[in-house]
């Protein structure tokens, strides 16, 4: 019983400790740039609604990144699908001396609901994203694993008698375990694109995405005070995607 009381006292003291810290400087930085993403994916369908996906994504300067994804999806009923994926991220601008710097790991857990209305197909996807930080970090400033909820609403219109579809998307990123000062929306991703169903197995997509990114960086000084940096990025992205289904 004594331990339980001490534990609750500790919880009550945490907000006091945070409030006692003083933000001695607060800076804002912003950048705007354009980049291209090239994506190739292979999807293998099995019985009982199972699908296996392998995907490679290359991002151009200034990001210089590559994402390799392996995932599995299960459609239990016509309107709902569940999936999970592992993503290996490679950063080309971090140097090649330390794998903890240029390699990162991510896990995605998805639930998607969709419905068809004539030529329209509407879907809502909720994704829990776990982003792992490797190497040495200050755990008072950053998390070893960031938890982010990504909510995406998508509308697809199939042009009658044509192998073409127009696709519009809106995705919102919400932090779930940000350090201090509460959670916040970290990304907004409106997107518009055109899909061409070449044949039964091959699909091409061309899209434009505007990516608003906000991050809040906290630095704890030796004195115990804080410096707070608000970082904004505005990205204009062209995406070219090829998918092979079998």
Map each language-model feature to its residues.
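Bacterial Sec-dependent N-terminal signal peptides
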Residues: 1-26, 246
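Outer-membrane beta-barrel initiation region
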Residues: 21-45
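Solvent-exposed loop/turn segments connecting transmembrane beta-strands
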Residues: 27-36, 57-67, 178-185, 232-233
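Membrane-embedded beta-strand positions in outer-membrane beta-barrel channels/transporters
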Residues: 39, 69, 108-110, 150-154, ...
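Repeated loop/turn-to-beta-strand initiation elements of outer-membrane beta-barrel proteins
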Residues: 46-53, 79-84, 118-122, 161-166, ...
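Hydrophobic/aromatic-rich structural module bridging two neighboring secondary-structure elements via a short loop
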Residues: 64-120
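Outer-membrane beta-barrel "beta-signal"
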Residues: 111, 232-246
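Outer-membrane beta-barrel transmembrane domain signature
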Residues: 125-225, 229, 243-246
């Amino acid at each position: 019983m004594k331990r339980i009381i001490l534990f609750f006292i500790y919880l009550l003291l945490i907000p006091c400790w945070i409030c006692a810290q003083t933000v001695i400087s607060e800076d804002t930085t912003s950048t705007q740039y354009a980049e291209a993403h090239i994506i190739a994916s292979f999807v293998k369908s099995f019985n009982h609604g199972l699908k296996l996906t392998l995907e490679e994504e290359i991002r151009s300067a200034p990001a210089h990144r590559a994402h390799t994804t392996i995932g599995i999806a299960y459609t239990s009923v016509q309107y709902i699908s569940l999936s999970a994926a592992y993503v290996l991220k490679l950063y080309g601008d971090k140097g090649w001396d330390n794998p903890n710097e240029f390699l990162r790991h991510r896990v995605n857990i998805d639930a998607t609901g969709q419905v068809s209305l004539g030529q329209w197909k509407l879907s809502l996807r909720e994704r829990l994203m776990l982003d792992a930080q490797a190497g040495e970090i200050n755990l008072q400033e950053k998390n070893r694993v960031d938890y982010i909820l990504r909510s995406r609403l998508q509308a697809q219109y199939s042009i009658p008698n044509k192998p073409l579809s127009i696709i519009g998307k809106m995705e919102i990123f919400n932090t779930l375990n940000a350090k201090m000062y509460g959670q916040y929306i970290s990304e907004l991703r409106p997107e518009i694109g055109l899909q061409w169903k070449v044949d039964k197995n091959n699909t091409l997509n061309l899209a434009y995405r505007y990516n608003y990114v906000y991050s809040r960086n906290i630095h704890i000084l030796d004195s115990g005070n804080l410096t707070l940096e608000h970082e904004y990025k505005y990205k204009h992205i062209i995406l070219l995607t090829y998918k092979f289904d079998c």
